[in-house]
A protein has these predicted regions:
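Hydrophobic cores of alpha-helical transmembrane segments in multi-pass integral membrane proteins
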Residues: 21-123, 134-155, 167-192, 208-235, ...
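Extramembrane terminal tails and long inter-domain/linker segments of multi-pass membrane proteins
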Residues: 1-24, 49-57, 196-204, 341
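Cytoplasmic juxtamembrane interface segments
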Residues: 4-16, 148-163, 294
Length: 359
């Protein structure tokens, strides 16, 4: 379906909703697949013989498939769909190129299929959330550059002067993920299916968790905040509670989040000052995170009655509640004394799942 509302000048605009719908459908499909794999490997922890002594069904190979499917297939398709949907409606223009938008869709599905083939076969870099080997990494980089061109190109031809705050969050996520992906995956290929990362030892660990933490921070947080800042006011039929707070939320989040990665490496050979730095910035993150949560929830001021009848608003408010809970739990678990108790326990797994599924 091609939407045709009026632009700022009153001229009808035919939005490209085809690619949005395609990504939305694949979001559902990959969500089912990713969570089904998660249920299967959880069952393997109880009944190990479920792997039937087949290496490609072993927990060690399917766990990366589960995380990649949920984060990059399920979450990624949701973000492509929502960013394309929102940027058109807040800029009052059609996507700058339908063909390039279609390329990002088919290219991203190819990446997902290649991941689904290579990970169970054990073709991996062995880096969490960055397991895919160098040919797939290159393909991701190409797709991401095209995605950035489509998004920023659409912003450049907008019919309204103002850039809505949701687009700031999407822009930050697109730029940051590009930097993280390229820097963390710098490697020397030795064959089509094998490469060696250029970093070693504790430097490799630091770069990996700079990437790993901020993949969560920008892919699963900043980008979904962009979604929140559009759909919560839209569904509530009210302006965002405090637009000024949303701008402060944006700049505080992107300034602080990048420094918090070392909290994944407490009590390791990472220098103690780096661990402490990560802890401090993680604790500071509580302020902008809760500011954003409060901003979203307070947008319903004067419209709380809609929660009784609007199922979409119910989901949005519950997701904001989970966001608040997870962003309290994360800074708390980054404190070294707390981390000494929580590290390598199911609490960490619960924290990740409450954030990913709840938010």
């Amino acid at each position: 379906m091609q939407s045709a509302p009026a632009s700022a000048q009153g001229i009808p605009v035919a939005y490209n909703d085809t690619v949005v719908r395609q990504f939305a459908i694949m979001t559902i499909i990959w969500g089912i697949v990713g969570m089904a794999v998660g249920v299967f490997i959880a069952a393997e922890l109880i009944w190990p013989t479920l792997n039937f002594d087949l290496p490609w069904l072993s927990y060690g190979r399917l766990r990366p498939l589960h995380t990649n499917a949920v984060i990059f297939a399920f979450g990624g398709c949701a973000l492509f769909a929502s960013s394309y949907y929102i940027v058109q409606r807040t800029c009052h223009v059609r996507l700058i190129s339908d063909k390039l938008a279609a390329f990002t869709f088919w290219g991203w599905q190819l990446v997902i299929l290649l991941a689904a083939i290579t990970l169970p076969l054990g073709i991996t870099q062995g880096k969490e959330y960055a397991e895919l080997e160098w040919p797939i990494d290159l393909l991701i980089a190409v797709i991401w550059v095209v995605y950035a061109f489509v998004f920023f190109g659409t912003l450049a031809i907008r019919k309204v002067r103002h850039i809505y705050v949701a687009n700031w969050f999407f822009a930050a996520y697109i730029i940051t993920i590009a930097v993280l992906h390229i820097m963390n995956n710098l490697a020397i290929p030795v064959s089509l299916t094998k490469s060696y990362v250029i970093y070693s030892g504790v430097v490799d660990a630091m770069v990996e968790w700079w990437y790993g933490h901020n993949a969560v921070g920008f892919f699963l947080t900043a980008a979904f905040l962009g979604m929140m800042y559009y759909f919560v006011p839209k569904q509530a039929g009210r302006p965002i509670y405090s637009y000024r707070l949303s701008v402060v939320h944006f700049w505080a989040l992107i300034s602080i989040y990048m420094w918090a990665g070392p909290h994944h490496l407490h009590y390791t050979t990472l220098p103690d000052w780096a661990q402490s730095l990560g802890m401090v910035f993680s604790v500071i993150l509580l302020a902008p995170s809760w500011g954003g949560m409060i901003n979203g929830i307070m947008t319903l001021s004067g419209a709380w009655y809609k929660l009784r009848t609007d199922p979409i608003l119910k989901f949005l408010i519950v997701s904001l509640s989970f966001y608040g809970m997870s962003t309290f739990e994360g800074p708390m678990m980054s404190i070294k004394t707390v981390n000494a108790l929580s590290h390598n326990t199911d609490w960490t797994i619960g924290h990740v799942h409450s954030g990913a599924l709840g938010w």
